[in-house]
Amino acid sequence: KTGFWSSLLTPLTYLIVNGTLLVIIWQGYISIQGEVLSQGALIALINYLLQILVELVKLAMLINSLNQSYISAKRIEEVFAEAPEDIHSELEQKQATNEQVLQVQELTFTYPDAAQPSLRGISFDMKQGQILGIIGGTGSGKSSLVQVLLGLYPADKESIDLYRNGRSPLNLEQWRSWISYVPQKVELFKGTIRSNLTLGLNQEVTDQELWQSLEIAQAKDFVSEKEGLLDATVEAGGRNFSGGQKQRLSIARAVLRQAPFLILDDATSALDTITESKLLKAIRENLPNTSLILISQRTSTLQMADQILLLEKGELLAIGKHEDLMKSSQVYREINASQHGKED
């Protein structure tokens, strides 16, 4: 309701201004014809009125800005009112084999204040160095699953176990430190390529390590062409880089962290299939102990995955390799056919 009246404020102000001018000009014409008012007096009256009306327009714009600021302030207050997260509370310690890194059993998750769960009864496991693919349509639960894996939301019951060298994390802070995450919509910050790559790192890194991460992310070639190389300028929002270049730089930043888990959430969507294939092969060859979780809309991206989760309406519809799903899942075949024109 507030937004409705705010949107009407400016056009209503201009309507009143122009309507008033029209009335004055019409009445002035009548007064001049009756020799009650001179032409000079009419022009002076219009000029004075315009000055007043211009300030009224400014006042209307100020009121609109204040209204928007008030709404934004209320939202910020809601964020500050949230209870702080306790990321240092100890989690239950568990052990597993060195190969086992992720185990999900009957995962169910419901967003706060939501009536229905977004994820229901999802189970799978993952071994060290494997590639896990996740695919599904809009509303299938891909984003919800990622947010739970990242520790941003708790599951409805304890159903996710994360391991590193056979041991589970001590607390939520350590849980999150084990995961590098790259979203589809990536952000670069004003500075240099070096400052963007090392953003958030707690340890010093060498130029050799920076170039290695760029090479894995298939970003070395275009960075080598930049004036200043690693110290080349990055404009705010990465405006001087294409979408694919920004995605590759963000992947290089995640690779540099050397976390045991790497999640690429549709983070190669702006890359062509050849570059994408080279990038995924480079991750597998150069980071053999890193477990990669790959969310994508393209079946071609997931063909090298050790297993693929096919989600639909928050449930696990099918699981297996690309070849297995092509044989066993009609839904997966339809997704593949819609992208390639045939069921291959």
Residue ranges and their predicted role:
Residues 1-19, 34, 65-68, 85, ...:
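An intracellular "coupling" helix at the cytosolic face of ABC transporter transmembrane type-1 domains
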Residues 20-27, 54, 71, 218:
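Transmembrane alpha-helix boundary/anchor motif
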